[in-house]
Amino acid sequence: MVDVNRLKEEVIASYREICKENYRLLVFIVGPPGSGKSTIAEKLKDAINTSYLDYLKEIDRKTLRCENYNHINIDQFVQGIEGETISSALEDERHENFDSVENVDFICKKKRLKDGSYTITGRGGQLNAIKVRQPTSQEKNLEGNTTIAEVLPMDGFHLSRECLDHFSDPQWAHLRRGSSLTFDSNNFLKLCEIMAKTSRIFPSIGYDGDDFTAFDAISSSFDCSVPSVEVPGFDHSLKDPQPSQHTISFKSRIVIFEGLYLLYNKENWSKIYNIVSNSNAKLFYKILACEDQIESRVAKRHLKAGLVASIEDGKDKFRKNDLLNARDVEKNSISSEDIRLIRND
C-alpha cells in the first residue's frame, strides 16, 4: 500500500526547494498496467489540493496575488517546436490522410487560431491535439476553491480506433492497443516540451529570505499571463481519445503526469526524461508491483469494463497484451539515481 500522505509531503517539500526559480513542479508517476498509478496520481492530487484549501482557510485570502508578472506571449511556448504553421486546408487534408499513423518521426504541426491560441497536432490528428491559449476571465478568478495540483494522464494520447484501422497490420494494432506504437508519442513529447518551458517561468514570490512555506510562495506568485494548456483525455464510453479534456492553467503549480511509457527508453518516449530534467523542476516515481498482483487487478478491470466475459478471459487478455507491454518497458526503462521507487503490491 502506497502512503499517499508521505508522497504529498515529499512533493510539497520538493516544490519549496525550487519555488524561487521555477513556476511549477512536474511530477511523473510511472508504472505497469495494474500498478495503481492512475489511482495514486488522483489521490496525490486530491491530498495536495485538500492541504492547500486547508491552508487558505487559515490566511487572509486577500494575500492571494494574481498579476501579469512576466507579460508572457504564448508564441514563445510553440517556438522551437518542430513543425510549421499550417492552413485550414492542409489540416483538413491531414484528417483524410492516415499515411503517417505509424511514423514515430512525424513532424508535429501547429495552427494559429483567430483568437491567438494554437493547436498542435501529431500523427493522431485532432483527437490527440494540444491547445495553448490565454487564460479566460473565469480562470483568473482566485475566489472559491482554488486548486494547485492537476493530473495529466497519458491515456489521452491513445491513437483512435480509426487511426489503428489504417496501420499496415490493423488486426495487430487493435489487438495490441496500449503498446507504445499505438500512442501519439510525437504529440505527447511536444506536451512535455511545453510543460517544461512553463516550469522554467520565473516566479515573482512575495517573500524575501527563507521564512515562508511552499504554499506561501504559491499564493504570492500566481501569474495570470502563464498560458493555459488543454490536453486530450480518453473517453471510455467512446473507446477513443477526445481533445480538451484536461486543462492546465496558471493556477496549476504541481502537474502530475501518469502513464506506462514515461521512462521508456525507445523512440519519442526516450526524450521525455532529459527534456523535463533540464527544467530542474521534476520528480519521478516508479511503481513496482509483482506480476501476479497486476494480472489480478487488470483482469478484474477488463471484466468490469465489459471487455471480457470472465476473470480467466481477463487474465488471458492481460497476458497477450498488457503483460507484454509491461515487460517491454521494464526491459527498456531509463534508470537514474533520482528516480524514486515505491511498491504497490
From Swiss-Prot:
Keywords: ATP-binding, Kinase, Nucleotide-binding, Transferase. One of its GO terms (molecular function) is kinase activity. Coiled coil: none annotated. Its EC number is 2.7.1.-. InterPro entries: P-loop_NTPase. PANTHER family: URIDINE KINASE. ATP-dependent kinase that could be involved in endoplasmic reticulum membrane assembly. This is ATP-dependent kinase YFH7. It comes from Candida glabrata (strain ATCC 2001 / BCRC 20586 / JCM 3761 / NBRC 0622 / NRRL Y-65 / CBS 138). The lineage of its organism: Eukaryota, Fungi, Dikarya, Ascomycota, Saccharomycotina.
